[in-house]
């Protein structure tokens, strides 16, 4: 459902209502900056950036749906959780939303950020070192570094780590100690098969891959340039 039609059912409903409506009309760089100020003000007053509306969607989910990638990065930097699903309709995460959108320099970069943040939160919230015969925090950190690269030369390495994450998930499911663990749900929300990963980028032009590979982890300004050129 579009942000302007949300049904707010939460303690900070007024703030969420205002922010969702403001987000739905953002088009220019000035409006992006104004929205960031609104979010900062709300956060200073105790607003929960991961709050869901009546349709169980977060601000991060809506910003990805509306292709407002700079705002999505801003929300991630301020604590937005990319692992939260839209639990009423399609049951997907912000990452799933961006994956289905046309491959552009900005959308690919945001995909990288969402993947990185998802896996980092997984590392921070859980000590994988206690799990025998599985991956360690070091493995995941290494995986994140390589996952940020989309060039074909790294596909074999990335595929290996995707399989490792699936092995971890299977291990947790079989182990009664972790059978009801939230870790399993989080893994399920971010995992794709190695085959699906490779398919995601096999049709990309080499020029776009080269440009995206060169982008440093800082989106601010990139989307602004595109907006100013098309406004």
From Swiss-Prot:
Report the domain of life of the source organism: Bacteria
* Listed InterPro entries: Ankyrin_rpt, Ankyrin_rpt-contain_sf
ANK repeat feature ranges: 55-87
Keywords of the record: ANK repeat
Entry-linked Gene3D superfamilies:
Ankyrin repeat-containing domain
Q: What is this protein called?
A: Putative ankyrin repeat protein RBE_0555
One Pfam family it belongs to: Ank
